[in-house]
Regions:
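C-terminal edge-of-domain segments
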Residues: 204-218, 223-226, 324-351
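N-terminal basic/disordered segments at the start of proteins
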Residues: 1-38, 334-343, 347-350
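Conserved mixed alpha/beta catalytic, RNA-binding, or beta-rich assembly cores of soluble enzyme
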Residues: 14, 18-24, 30-31, 39, ...
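C-terminal non-catalytic interaction/assembly regions of soluble proteins
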Residues: 262-323, 329-333, 339-343
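N-terminal beta-loop-helix "entrance" segment that forms/cooperates
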Residues: 33-57, 276-277, 301-307
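Short, structured active-site "lid" loops
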Residues: 48-72, 283-290
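N-terminal glycine-rich "phosphate-gripper" loop used for MgATP/nucleotide binding
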Residues: 67-75, 80-83
Length: 351
C-alpha cells in the first residue's frame, strides 16, 4: 500500500483547461496553486517573475510538484535543478483533460509514484509509471523506506543493488523485528520473500532487516538493515551545555536500550530551550526536528516523573525530559531516564 503525503504540494497550470482541472484537484487535496496573472482566479497565486522562475523556487521548497500541461515543459524548466532521487521532490505531470497522470521524477524515494496513483484514482485517469519494479508489479527498497520513514547507513548502494535484484527475480528476503510487525500491512512488500526467523533463513540472495535495534546477529547472507524513525528523546539541560556532551550522553542512552541511532525521530524540550545552541546543533547533527513544549503543557504530565525544585524555579516545571518524551511518544517510554552532568534524557517510541 502506497502512502501519499500531501501536506506540501505545489501545482502549476498555464491554460484555462489547466485552471479548471486544478480547481477540481484543489477541492479534494490540499494544494498551493500557481498560474499566470491573466488566468488567476480566487485561490490561485500568480507567478513570481514568470512560470519558470516560480517553478524553480518551488522545486526547493515543496515536497511535490504537479504540472498540468505538456511533459516537455516540465522537463525543460526543471532540468537544471535535477540532482538526486533521494533529495529531489516528487514531480507529476497531468494533461489538462485529466486523462493521464505521469510520474516524472522521484517515483520511489520522493513518492511520485504513490502520488500519481492517488491523483489518477481521484480523476479516473490512467496512471503512467515506468519504474522497472512497478511495471513488474514489485515493490522497491526505496518505496519501502519511504513508506516506513526509514533510514539506512548505505541506502544509495542498497537501493541500486536490491532493486536490480528484484527485477532480475533474485530472492531478496524481508525480516521484521517483532515490535514492528504491525506495520507490515501499511507497506508494499511485493517481490520480497517473507522471513520469520533469522536463525532459520531460506535460500536467499540478499536480506533486508527492518529493525530499530543495533544488536542483529551475524548473518550468512548479503544483508542491510532498514531503520524506521520511531525513537524520540526528551532532553533537559543547563544553559550552554556543550554539544559534544549532549551527543555523547544521547549516544550512550540509545546504546543502553540497544537502539540504532538512525531510529531517532525527534528531540524535545521545554520552550525556554528553543534557542539552546547545544540542543539545536544536536538535532541538526541527527537530522531530526527539535520540538519544544511550554512549561504549562509539560506540567500536565510531570506527575509521572521525579521533579526538581531547582528545575521548577528555572524553567517553570519540575521535570523536562520525561514529560517531553511522554508528549512525543504518547506515553510510550523506553527504559530509565539518564541523569548526568546536569543533563536528563528520556527515550520513547512513537509509531
Amino acid at each position: 500500500m502506497n502512502t501519499v503525503k500531501p501536506e506540501s504540494i505545489a501545482l502549476f497550470c498555464l491554460t484555462p483547461g489547466g485552471v479548471a482541472l486544478a480547481k477540481r484537484l484543489a477541492a479534494m487535496l490540499p494544494l498551493t496553486c500557481f498560474t499566470s496573472e491573466k488566468l488567476r482566479e480566487e485561490g490561485f497565486i500568480p507567478f513570481d517573475g514568470g512560470f519558470a522562475n516560480t517553478a524553480r523556487q518551488a522545486f526547493t521548497t515543496y515536497t511535490a510538484l504537479i504540472f498540468i500541461g505538456a511533459t516537455g515543459i516540465a522537463v525543460r524548466v526543471l532540468a537544471p535543478l535535477v540532482n538526486d532521487k533521494f533529495s529531489d521532490p516528487a514531480v507529476v505531470v497531468i494533461d489538462e483533460r485529466g486523462q493521464h497522470v505521469i510520474s516524472l521524477l522521484s517515483g520511489h524515494a520522493g513518492g511520485a509514484n504513490a502520488l500519481t496513483r492517488y491523483l489518477a484514482g481521484m480523476l479516473g485517469a490512467d496512471p503512467v509509471i515506468t519504474t522497472a519494479t512497478d511495471v513488474n508489479e514489485m515493490s522497491a527498497l526505496d518505496t519501502l523506506a519511504f513508506q516506513l520513514n526509514a533510514r539506512m547507513s548505505d541506502l544509495r548502494t542498497a537501493v541500486k543493488t536490491v532493486n536490480q535484484m528484484l527485477v532480475s527475480h533474485q530472492r531478496v528476503g524481508l525480516w521484521w523485528d517483532a515490535e514492528l510487525t504491525e506495520e507490515i500491512g501499511q507497506c508494499d512488500i511485493r517481490g520480497f520473500i517473507p522471513v520469520d526467523d533469522l536463525q532459520r533463513l531460506p535460500e536467499l540472495d540478499a536480506l533486508i532487516c527492518v529493525s530499530l535495534r543495533n544488536d542483529l546477529p551475524e548473518l550468512p547472507v548479503l544483508h542491510w538493515k532498514l531503520v524506521p524513525q520511531r525513537v524520540v528523546a526528551g532532553i533537559g539541560c543547563r544553559r550552554d551545555t556543550p554539544f559534544p556532551l549532549l551527543a555523547t550522553l544521547l549516544a550512550r542512552q540509545l546504546e543502553a536500550q540497544k537502539l540504532d541511532p538512525l531510529a531517532l525521530k525527534a528531540i524535545g524540550s521545554v520552550t525556554l530551550k528553543k534557542g539552546e545552541p547545544g540542543l539545536m546543533q544536536l538535532a541538526s547533527c541527527c537530522r531530526v526536528p527539535f520540538k519544544t513544549f511550554t512549561a504549562e503543557v509539560l506540567r500536565e504530565f510531570e506527575h509521572h516523573f521525579p521533579g526538581s525544585g531547582f528545575v521548577r524555579k528555572t524553567v517553570g516545571v519540575g521535570s523536562v525530559s520525561g514529560p517531553a518524551a511522554w508528549l512525543l511518544s504518547q506515553g510510550q517510554l523506553l527504559g530509565e531516564t539518564l541523569r548526568e552532568q546536569g543533563v536528563t534524557i528520556t527515550l520513547g517510541v512513537s509509531h
